[in-house]
């Protein structure tokens, strides 16, 4: 009778027999009443079977639709020291259709090169789901040092444009070839 939420209806239709193990007919020999009209979502459903006509007595049974398990996993991220943090994201596994679960992501404080935990938090029970949260890691790598330009060997900006011998050149004391 019990079922795990799967987006489908789980309406239990009881089979009723008398003491001689004769199968009784719904509507003629007994009636069935349910405590709800929602047979899809998580909850406890009470079923009341009442004798009718030649049969008397009432029997009550309950069954449950229990939450489906969902996992939210923070995705690992990397950045170089001094850069802004990447956007924190997570993957959700186990929801059905367009269903969503709510959660918040944050990371352990710190900016030095190293590893920092990315935490994901939210309610454990969300509607039709029981949610498990899995942390990720932000790795901050060391920044490489830029040696810059050697002052003895200047690195002029090249534009790629062809230079012709200029007619208005001024002698600056250095040799120039065209």
Segments predicted by a language model, with ranges:
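Solvent-exposed beta-strand/loop surfaces, strongest in extracytoplasmic domains of secreted
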Residues: 1-178
């Amino acid at each position: 009778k019990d079922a795990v939420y799967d987006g489908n209806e789980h309406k239990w239709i009881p089979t009723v027999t008398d003491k001689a193990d004769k199968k009784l007919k719904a509507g003629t020999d007994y009636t069935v009443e349910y405590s709800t009209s929602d047979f899809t979502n998580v909850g406890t459903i009470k079923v009341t079977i009442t004798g009718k006509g030649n049969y008397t007595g009432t029997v009550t049974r309950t069954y449950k639709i229990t939450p489906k398990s969902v996992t939210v996993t923070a995705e690992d991220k990397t950045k170089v020291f001094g850069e802004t943090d990447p956007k924190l994201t997570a993957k959700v596994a186990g929801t059905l259709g367009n269903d969503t679960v709510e959660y918040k992501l944050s990371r352990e404080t710190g900016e030095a090169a190293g590893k920092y935990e990315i935490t994901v938090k939210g309610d454990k029970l969300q509607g039709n789901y029981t949610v498990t949260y899995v942390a990720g890691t932000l790795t901050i790598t060391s920044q490489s040092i830029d040696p810059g330009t050697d002052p003895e060997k200047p690195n002029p900006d090249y534009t790629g444009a062809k230079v012709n011998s200029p007619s208005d050149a001024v002698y600056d004391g250095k040799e120039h070839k065209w």
